[in-house]
Amino acid sequence: GYLSHPERRYPVIFAFQGIPGSVDAYQQNLPVGQIIPSLVSAQRIRDAIVVVPTVFPNNLDTECVDSADGSVRMDTFVSSDLVAWAKANLRTVDRPDAWATLGFSAGGWCSSMLTLRHPETFGYSLSLSGYFQIRFNGSALRPDGDPVYDLGRIASEQAPSVKLWFWTAKDDSAPYDSVQQFAPKVRAPTVLTVALVEAGGHSWAVWTAGTQAGLQWLGENSAQFAWVAS
């Protein structure tokens, strides 16, 4: 582990919760501190640093964006301030293919959005039942049709060199419909991989299986996350 190998640098995963929810989800419902070591033991992925920020303070639906009026700057906090903190204070591998995002539900949107908007930092996104069109549950922090956070536009016009992995149940209509609408807009070098399960709805069972599957996919698709002998 991290403390046992002070000479070693590690890839990084930024993990985002849903709303309503809390960062505790990644200890209780999706215990990445147990899931990753089990995958390391199975030689499917290497050890990684996981950073779990609060992106919905007091369940305020920020959608991880910078608001139009400047009152909320969650995008800047995560992609600039928190990234800089992690690089300065943790033994990270400083290259985009060693940085991934992970999120479920609204956190899945954050994962896809932050990776598409900041390919200089994040090379991979793992979205569990997320979506690709911004949707505020409460006050809208950005105007309708805002091009800054239009992921379809970014994927088709800018085509950042990132890999997106999307997992959902077919009977979870909002995420399923969202990825169907987004997929045709993706062009190279952006890559979208969609993994579907037949049923399960918007649930922890789906996301638990998806976390396992997504991390294995990450280990298979990034040399920086691929398993290496200790």
Q: Over which residues does each language-model region extend?
A:
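Non-catalytic cap/lid and distal C-terminal segments of serine-dependent acyl enzymes
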Residues: 1-230
